[in-house]
């Protein structure tokens, strides 16, 4: 039984939404990659920063909506965002987090109970895992889900528009498709601007500064067949690169590929 199927079964037995059941599983240390888990529900990237930087980061997201589409934001010090889910606790409901100090990643805890501060503001940003359901429903293969690994992600030479201390390169996620499939993937994902929308680049990874597609900066490599082209989407891991470059004294993000699963429905984010 797959992780997603197990979550669906547990949720049905407990009378919970699959998204809620997944969060409970992660809260108690069960599970790993969230790809393909609780299908139909929106997943989000996390950027958690001190309140004094929140205004500049909010503007950074507004200036860079492709990699940083905001789907939720907390009040300072509040680990709950009720609009995103019942019993959703930012401190415990993600499989793994990253703690940053002065731009360096210093720890990868499975909860934030020992790290939480009263001035922290949480930004939840749209994730491409949300549109993968629509791709699969149309019969398109998702390689990293087929292989049970994390989606490959790469730093690029595409510069984000800066705001205050926040500046740096866009990070992209990659999924390989045959050319006809790639065209269909563009058509489908254009409907989901709240979770990165259409791709930012197709083929020729060197044109966006990717030297070796077999060596992603985040996530896991997946094979690209001779009759396939790599398709790249703006990625919500971009804030990790930006926060690192800003050298904030303290910040928290999710570990790449290990997302927050919300109670929002993917279908409700579609614009067409």
Swiss-Prot record:
Enzyme class, first EC level, given as a word: lyase
Domain of life: Bacteria
Entry's EC annotation: 4.2.1.-
Keywords: Lyase
Record GO terms (molecular function): lyase activity
Residues in the signal sequence: none
Keyword Lyase annotated: yes
Stored SUPFAM superfamilies: PSTPO5379-like
Keyword Lyase annotated: yes
Stored NCBIfam families: PRK05463.1
Family the UniProt entry places it in: Belongs to the D-glutamate cyclase family.
Stated name of the protein: Putative hydro-lyase BBta_2883
Source species: Bradyrhizobium sp. (strain BTAi1 / ATCC BAA-1182)
